[in-house]
């Protein structure tokens, strides 16, 4: 179920204030955030936000096509480790 339109998109308050401050200064700095559930808004376009995946921060450059999505969608949280096919040499 999606969020109600009358409520507006969810954005962490501290992250929003940092973005607004950088827009006033016209500075391009990397912001660290743990808020994977924050929605990307048009004011974030052009900024780099380092999103925490549970182990480390991944830098995400925000483009206009990302507006409306969540920050956590662009950061992988799990590593895929496939099973190695057993060779005939190892069976000997």
Curated annotation (Swiss-Prot):
It is found in: Plastid, Chloroplast. One of its GO terms (biological process) is translation. It comes from the Eukaryota. GO terms for cellular component: chloroplast; mitochondrial small ribosomal subunit. PANTHER family: RIBOSOMAL PROTEIN S19P FAMILY MEMBER, SMALL RIBOSOMAL SUBUNIT PROTEIN US19M. Protein S19 forms a complex with S13 that binds strongly to the 16S ribosomal RNA. Belongs to the universal ribosomal protein uS19 family. HAMAP family: Ribosomal_uS19 (MF_00531). This is Small ribosomal subunit protein uS19c. It comes from Gracilaria tenuistipitata var. liui (Red alga).
